[in-house]
Every structure is written in structure tokens, then in C-alpha cells.
UniProtKB/Swiss-Prot annotation:
NCBIfam families: hutI. GO terms for molecular function: imidazolonepropionase activity; iron ion binding; zinc ion binding. This is Imidazolonepropionase. Catalyzes the hydrolytic cleavage of the carbon-nitrogen bond in imidazolone-5-propanoate to yield N-formimidoyl-L-glutamate. It is the third step in the universal histidine degradation pathway. The keyword Hydrolase applies. The gene is hutI. It is found in: Cytoplasm.
Length: 410
């Protein structure tokens, strides 16, 4: 047994399911307690550490649950640096896509890479996320286009899931329709790939938006995946509102992701479907779009998660930066974003029984931060405040100096 000691504060949501509405802001705070860890799980939150227990001095910092990143495109090869400058000069996302670049560029790079290269580039990014406090990550396919390419990405994800440092949730993503290919025929093909790999994936996802799949094709794909017993997610309303949410009425979709452009009727359907919303504020930052108002979603009783959406478009794996943007621009408070980065995404990924909160019996997935209080986390977004990342009781990253970041004299 070991104990995390000298913690000024432990802050966590509670429970084994989504927190929504007013409860999304419920955070339990322990002052000057220790966390006992045994067998990779949280044994107890206590004031008194038993004798003979290995003590890990946390330097007066704050412990929160390990961050759960529920939406990533981290598995790919290559980069899109030229597109970054094109967007800065005013070229739109859709114009880049229609020219055969954007997602199509990454598809070409990834299809031409072998599995080992995809693995090496991806695991490097995973370790970067670990240093920023992430202990669980959803990873999508989507850059392979055909069965062979998607299975190559999925194999790289599986290696990371089985041998890597963090918990991984594989998702099959129907990303875009190949140029000069008929949409209905392509959907038939990808459904065969999903069927062939249904034991290897935890979720099925589709990008329903301008320049991607139509609402009709998206519903067909989602219905088929659900019929196979695969839970469904959806990318939607990122570029435009083309009616994707309305087309999903009655489907048990776990999470509607992006949701930049929505109306009240869309939120009614999300609520009726018993679904959640995952906001991706770093992507909005990268696209220089207007941020959606999370208050409209939370106040309807819909649970909200946040994610990094790390991808070649958005090379950022920092959940703390996502929390900062969600407070600053999506109008969430410190308590809501803490739960949006921990328990709610854990519930979104079907892991809330064992992850997402600091409670006895759950996995010891923890982040120790050089702060005095959890509400400083979004505020200190630009500083190196992650002092320790722990996954299932194993210390994955330790900065060594666990001292408090002092901003009191500024």
C-alpha cells in the first residue's frame, strides 16, 4: 500500500454515472487528507496514514481524478503544417477539404505509413498527454479510408491499449466519403469493416456535417452499428447545422460531439434521446469559430463533457487548456469543467464504474497539480502545473518538484 500525502486539497465529483444540470457543479472537497492506494485502486481518503505505508509527498498540491479525454484523432501519421498557415490566411476548412487536403491529406499520409510508424508517432503523442494529466483516452480510426487502412490504425491503437501507459477506448470512425465515391456504396463498405472488427472496437462514430456524411447516410450507419451491439457516437454540427441531430431522433446515441451550431430543437432531441454532449473548445480555438454556449446545454439537464480533439488540425493534447477555454468561452464554471474532464467523459466511455472520481474501489487514476485549490486549474492553464500523473496506482510522470505555483504576489 502507498499513500499520497501532503495534499492541500482533494477535489472530485462523486458517483458512477453522468452529472447533469445543477449536479454537474457538485464537487466534493477534502482539505489536508491523504489518498491510500492498494492494488491499483483507491483504498481510502483519510486524515491518518497507517504506519508502514509508503508515503509519497505531494508538496501541498491538489489531487483531482485523472483526466479522461473522450474524443481524439491521435492515431495518424504525418502533419498538416501548411494547412495551419492556409487557415490563418483565411482559407476555410471546407475549401481546404474540397481541394483534396485537410482530412484527405492525413488519409494519404496514414495510408502510406506502416503500422509501426503510426504506432511510434501516436505513442509519442500519448506520452505528451500523460505529462498533462490524461489517464484515459478515446482513440478513433478514420484516416484509413478502406478496410485495410482502418484495420492498420486499429492495430496500432490496440498495441497502445495493451502495452501503453493509459487506458484506451478504441472507436471506429466513419470520417469522410472518399472523393469520387458514391456515399451509399461507401457506407455499405464501411459497415462491413465495422462488422468484421466489432470485437475490437468499443464505439462506432460518424462525421455528419457539411463536407462529410449526409444526415440520411449517418442515420443508416448508426442504426446498423447499434443493431450490431456497438454503442454509437456522432460528430455533428461542427461546420454547419445541416440537420444531423434532427435525423437522429430516437437513437440511443451516447454523445453528440462538437455541437458548435445548434438550435433549441436539436437540444430537445439530445435530451429526449438520453444523450450527452461533448464540447471541443480547442478545436473551436483552432478554427477561430464562435464558441457554443454550454449554459444552454447544462441548463436543460444534458450532461456535458469536454475533450481535446487532438488531431492534425488541432495539435493540442492539453485537457487543462480545454478546461480554460470552456470556462472562458463556453461559460462553464470551475466545478462544471472539472466534472466535464473527469466523471462525465468516463460515463460517456462506459467507464464511470471504475474511473472519473476519487472514491474507494475505483482505479487509482489521479493527477497531482501545483495549485492551492482546484479552481486554480483553469486559471493556471499556461503554466507547468501537473506535478504527477498516476494510472491504476502507477506513477507515469513525476516532475520531481511538487511545489506550489505561487501567483499571490503578482
Amino acid at each position: 500500500m502507498r499513500a499520497l500525502t501532503n495534499l492541500s486539497q482533494i477535489a472530485t465529483g462523486e458517483g458512477r454515472s453522468f452529472l447533469s444540470g445543477e449536479r454537474q457543479a457538485d464537487v466534493k472537497v477534502y482539505e489536508n487528507h491523504s489518498i491510500l492506494i492498494h492494488g491499483g485502486r483507491i483504498a481510502e481518503i483519510t486524515r491518518a496514514v497507517p504506519p508502514g505505508v509508503e508515503e509519497i509527498d505531494c508538496g501541498g498540491g491538489v489531487a483531482v481524478p485523472g483526466f479522461v479525454d473522450p474524443h481524439t484523432h491521435i492515431a495518424f501519421a504525418g502533419n498538416r503544417v501548411q494547412e495551419f498557415y492556409m487557415r490563418i490566411r483565411g482559407t476555410s476548412y471546407l475549401d481546404i477539404l474540397r481541394s483534396g487536403n485537410g482530412i484527405y491529406r492525413t488519409i494519404r499520409d496514414t495510408v502510406n505509413a506502416d503500422e509501426n510508424r503510426i504506432f511510434k508517432e501516436t505513442i509519442s503523442r500519448v506520452w505528451s498527454a500523460v505529462r498533462r494529466g490524461t489517464t484515459t483516452m478515446e482513440m478513433k480510426t478514420g484516416y484509413g479510408l478502406d478496410q485495410r487502412g482502418e484495420e492498420k490504425i486499429l492495430s496500432a491503437i490496440e498495441v497502445i491499449k495493451n502495452t501503453g501507459p493509459i487506458s484506451v477506448v478504441p472507436t471506429y470512425l466513419a470520417h469522410v466519403v472518399p472523393q469520387d465515391v458514391q456515399e451509399n456504396a461507401y457506407v455499405e463498405g464501411i459497415l462491413e469493416t465495422v462488422k468484421r472488427n466489432r470485437q475490437r472496437i468499443s464505439y462506432a462514430d460518424i462525421f455528419c456535417d457539411a463536407g462529410a456524411f449526409s444526415p440520411e447516410a449517418s442515420r443508416r450507419f448508426l442504426e446498423a452499428a447499434i443493431a450490431m451491439g456497438i454503442p454509437a457516437r456522432i460528430h455533428t454540427n461542427e461546420i454547419e447545422n445541416v440537420g444531423c441531430v434532427k435525423k437522429t431522433r430516437g437513437l440511443p446515441i451516447v454523445s453528440y460531439d462538437h455541437m458548435i451550431h445548434f438550435d433549441d430543437a436539436d437540444l430537445d432531441i439530445v435530451k429526449e434521446n438520453g444523450s450527452s454532449v461533448t464540447l471541443l473548445p480547442i478545436t473551436v480555438f483552432a478554427l477561430n469559430e464562435a464558441y457554443p454556449d454550454a449554459r444552454r446545454i447544462i441548463d436543460r439537464g444534458i450532461p456535458v463533457s469536454i475533450a481535446t480533439d487532438i488531431s492534425p488540425l488541432n495539435m493540442n493534447d492539453d485537457m487543462i487548456f480545454a478546461m480554460h477555454l470552456a470556462v472562458r468561452n463556453n461559460h462553464m464554471n470551475a466545478e462544471e469543467v472539472l466534472n466535464a474532464a473527469t466523471i462525465n467523459p468516463a460515463a460517456s466511455l462506459g467507464l464511470a464504474e471504475k474511473k472519473g472520481t476519487i472514491e474507494s474501489g475505483k482505479d487509482a487514476d489521479l493527477v497531482v497539480l501545483s495549485a492551492r485549490s482546484y479552481d486554480e486549474i483553469p486559471y493556471l492553464y499556461g503554466l507547468d502545473i501537473v506535478s504527477m500523473t498516476i494510472s491504476r496506482g502507477n506513477i507515469l510522470y513525476s516532475r520531481g518538484d511538487h511545489g506550489i505555483t505561487d501567483t499571490s504576489e503578482a
